Amino acid sequence: MKDEQMLTEWPSHLPWLNQSQNDFTFPSDTYLLLYFWSMSCPNCHQLTDKVLQDIKDMNVKVIGVHVPYIEEEKSMEVVLTYALDRGLAIPIVLDQNYEIVTTCHVQGIPSFCLLSQYGQIITKTMGDVGWDKMLKKIAGL
């Protein structure tokens, strides 16, 4: 597969919340689901709790990739406060310069990107309809 269809390492300079990036190396012991979201995204607000509930007992690790809409959302403190207020305990990486977004070819949020244990992009979806499709894909792993 082409390099742009792989995420073989995390950009080392990006800040993480709730966990260290060193806990997520490739190859991984499980599939990884990247959940691209933003504090300013109304659809993300509606979908986040459903995503976390649906995925709870599945063989996949969720990583929230925060995509800033505005400059203020590049602040780790602002995102941390939001995550604490919402009870988001999942690992969150702040993709402040859209590096992971670019690697995964994400075109809008909320979006989902399923990675193999080796960082290969298996499938990508967007929105609530996309979430339903992603659930079916994960259930078939």
Swiss-Prot record:
Record note on disruption phenotype: When the skfA-skfB-skfC-skfE-skfF-skfG-skfH operon is deleted, increased rate of spore formation; a double operon deletion (sdpA-sdpC plus skfA-skfH) makes spores even faster.
GO biological process: bacteriocin biosynthetic process
Cysteine pairings via disulfide bonds: C41-C44
Ranges where the Thioredoxin domain occurs: 2-141
Pfam families: Thioredoxin_8
Keyword set, alphabetical order: Antibiotic biosynthesis, Bacteriocin biosynthesis, Disulfide bond, Redox-active center
Keyword Manganese among UniProt keywords: no
Induction behaviour: By Spo0A and PhoP, during nutrient starvation, especially phosphate starvation. Repressed by AbrB during normal growth when nutrients are plentiful, in association with the transcriptional repressor Abh.
Additional record remark: Accelerated cannibalism by skf- cells is seen on solid media but not in liquid media.
Chain's role: Required for production of the bacteriocin SkfA.
Protein name listed in UniProt: Thioredoxin-like protein SkfH
